[in-house]
Each structure stands twice: as structure tokens, then as C-alpha cells.
């Protein structure tokens, strides 16, 4: 169920973020740069004065360049964007607070992050993580080398939240992840990260109502109606995203994962290239 104050909750976050000076610092990482482009370590200040890190990759040549912004998955380590992608796009990969390279003063626990502060919508860690995602998008919109009309968001629920609150992006390639219908799925699963919810309820058996209330503010179905940009949703299995499709309230592209990094990667690259109008995508040799 969508909370009555859903919009005001997220508006408050944005208002808090506006008051924080981003203070960007961009330092080249020579070991990672190539003849095709440079790789930078980008530091930004996010909510609460927290410094976050992102890999910021800029190709050589005359810009502005289209952008692929990769929102992080659930895990401690974020990798540099793929080489082929970096050759003709600005490619940026965020390490949100708690992930490695953004882990001072807070180093996230895995498992554990998914329920950090979940007793209240105001203290849930993903409220601050959402601000990290928005901070990077706001940075991109200030960069002269960025083609502001061609920004593609790629990722799970963090990418969906960003698309809902930053409609300046052009496209969203979205894979529903751990927050989508999370407690319903956790009730029939013993696999992590969803098992983190079950662990939490075993430790705090009277907390279920509080957790349900918090997660309603982060449920993808409550964000979907706010996403107006061109969207591809890749679901785990056929029919898994039916409720999300209904929540979007419009036609979006939809596919089911092949459970193959090669086949899913080719499809993703081709869809993004078509939407950004960058021609045939450059793919890894072992994919061709």
C-alpha cells in the first residue's frame, strides 16, 4: 500500500540534499585509463555530509557524449564499467555509502545492510543511499562533456528510484531486485539477501508492522507511476513483474532474463544503443 505521505517523504529528502554542497573532486586513475579514454575517481558529498565515490569514465574525442549511469547492485564491491562501454560513452558507476571506496566512516555488512535502520522510514539506510544515487545524477547534469539529452540509467531498484525522481534521464534499463514485493518473496525463500528480512524477524519478532511500513516508502510499485522515461524491465521469470507492469500504467518494454551474462548483456547493450542512437554497440570479443 502506498503511504499517504509518500510524495512528501521523498520531497523532504530532496530538499535536504539541495542544502548539501556536492564539492566534486575528480582525480584520474592512470592505471585504469586507456588510449580510448580516461578513468577518474569521482568524490561527491551526499546527504549528511557523507563523501561517496564513483568511477567516472570519459572517452577521448569531442563531446558531449551520451551517458550510461550504472546504479550499484547489492554487494560490497562495485567494478569499473566495461571497457567497450567506455570507448564511446561517458560511463559512471556509483559506490553508494557503505560499499567499498565509499566505506568511510560507514562500512556496510553483507548480510545486514538490507535491514539497517529499517525500524523507521527516517532511519532506514536506503533513504540515504537513494540520496547518493540522486547526487550522481545531479552531478552529471552540470557537466559540459555530458549530453544531457542522452543519459541511460541501468540497474535494479536504485535505478528505478532515480528515474522516478530525475526525469531528465532518457532511458531506464531496470531489473527488479530485492525491494520489489520483498516481504512476500522472503516468506517463501531462505536465500540471501531476502533471508535478511527473516533473520530480522527472528531477532525482533514484534517488528513486522514497523518493517512493512518502512518498506512501503521504497516499494518499486509505488515509484513506477512516476517514471515517465523510456523503460525496459527485465524480470526474473515470466509473469514475475505483472504487478509492476500494472503499476507503471503505460506501455513499457519487457523481457525475461536468459540467466546468461552474455545473452542478457547483448540485449541490454542493443536496447540502450537503440535508445541513445549510438549505432551498433561495441561488444566484448568473447560475446561476438
Which role fits each region the language model picked out?
Residues 1-37, 274, 278-288:
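N-terminal targeting or regulatory segments adjacent to alpha/beta-hydrolase or S9 domains
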Residues 2, 239-288:
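C-terminal catalytic histidine-bearing segment of alpha/beta-hydrolase fold enzymes
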Residues 18-62:
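N-terminal cap/lid segment of alpha/beta-hydrolase-fold proteins
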Residues 47, 61, 65, 70-77:
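Active-site glycine-rich loops that stabilize anionic/oxyanionic intermediates
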Residues 79, 83, 89-131:
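Cap/lid segment of the alpha/beta-hydrolase catalytic domain
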Residues 144-155:
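Alpha/beta-hydrolase fold nucleophile elbow
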Residues 159-205:
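Hydrolase active-site cap/lid region
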Residues 188-249, 253-257:
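The feature captures the conserved acid-bearing segment of alpha/beta-hydrolase catalytic domains
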